[in-house]
Amino acid sequence: MLVVKADYKKYPIPVLEKMRIDEDEFYKKYEACVVVQTCNRIEAYFDTEVNSNVDDILKDFQGFDILKGKNATFHFLKVSCGMDSMILGENQILGQIKTSFQKAREFKKTSRYLDSLFLKAIHVGQRARTETKINEGGVSIGSAAVELAEKNFGLTNRNVLLIGAGEIGTLVAKALVEKHIKAVIVANRTYERAETLAKELKGMAVHFDKLREAVNFSDVIICATSSPHYILEKEDLIDVGNKIIIDIANPRDVDDSVRELENIELYTIDDLRNISDKNLQRRIEEIPTVEKIIEEEYDVLMKQIEKINVEEVLKEFNTYIEEIRVKELEKAIKLSKSKDPEEIMENFSKAFAKRITHDFVSYSLNTSKEDLMNSAWWKNGK
């Protein structure tokens, strides 16, 4: 297997956005392949048994990191468990892998090997999340904000206002997706960005000049802009009813004097750091258990792949035998009118055996002893 990859560890998000693969064009060009793309990573997986043009692939993906064989497989299993994610153990990557795999199958671009790999990766990701706590507790400031709101106020059937649709706002949005919220409103100075994020949340976007109305409508307000000045001040919140406000912006979006209002509970980024740090430490402690699951499932996958390889060789071998049989039978039929049937059968069987022996000896002489002993044909022949 071959993997070409670019991710947040090497490139900033704006650069990754420019490196994104046009999936329709990708699937037109390559066989036996799957592309997995998220906001933080771009990866393409190739079955090299089908794609022998590895050099051409590498030319097409200059700037991408390259992984092959065992390293590529282990990498993908770690990705499925969220161990290679910006947020350790995050759940979203598993759904993205499933969606990517399904799209490749719709294009009829997978292979028996890639089918086995992706189904195994999905299974490993599920095991990691059910048998360990690698995905429990919010570890980003965004998810910690949502966790705090849920713990202190409850989010079921609440109206949530997210102010800010940048990087931090997006992290908040990811954490909100999994909650049973009545309504989500996204406000941002650039309305188009608010609209894009609101679609992901199945919510609604509002223009910034409608912020007052959105505040009145909301139960929970999460502020995550990059504004150099306050977005909400004391006079904005005097008669808006009971609200919980979580300000995770830096610099702050909410004037601290808001704490003087009895109807407002204000939390800042300092209140969240303890939550996220403790949760991250708990997730880190689960890494050895997840790695053990990956190693176990890798061994199972290799046995599945070996079986596939043997089946493919047997299929080719049967085709090869059948071709010889048909050719020798045609010769025998031509001779059947002029020779003794017993002699014809004798000659047919000898010619058949001689042809197989000749081809096997030729294969053996042109193959190293090590390769011969490791070949599925030899193992099966023994």
UniProtKB/Swiss-Prot annotation:
The record marks 75 as: Important for activity. Its EC number is 1.2.1.70. It catalyses: (S)-4-amino-5-oxopentanoate + tRNA(Glu) + NADP(+) = L-glutamyl-tRNA(Glu) + NADPH + H(+). Substrate binds at residues 38-41, 85, 90-92, 96. It is an enzyme of class 1 (oxidoreductase). The active site is at residue 39. Pathway: Porphyrin-containing compound metabolism; protoporphyrin-IX biosynthesis; 5-aminolevulinate from L-glutamyl-tRNA(Glu): step 1/2. During catalysis, the active site Cys acts as a nucleophile attacking the alpha-carbonyl group of tRNA-bound glutamate with the formation of a thioester intermediate between enzyme and glutamate, and the concomitant release of tRNA(Glu). The thioester intermediate is finally reduced by direct hydride transfer from NADPH, to form the product GSA. Belongs to the glutamyl-tRNA reductase family. This is Glutamyl-tRNA reductase. It comes from Methanococcus maripaludis (strain C7 / ATCC BAA-1331).
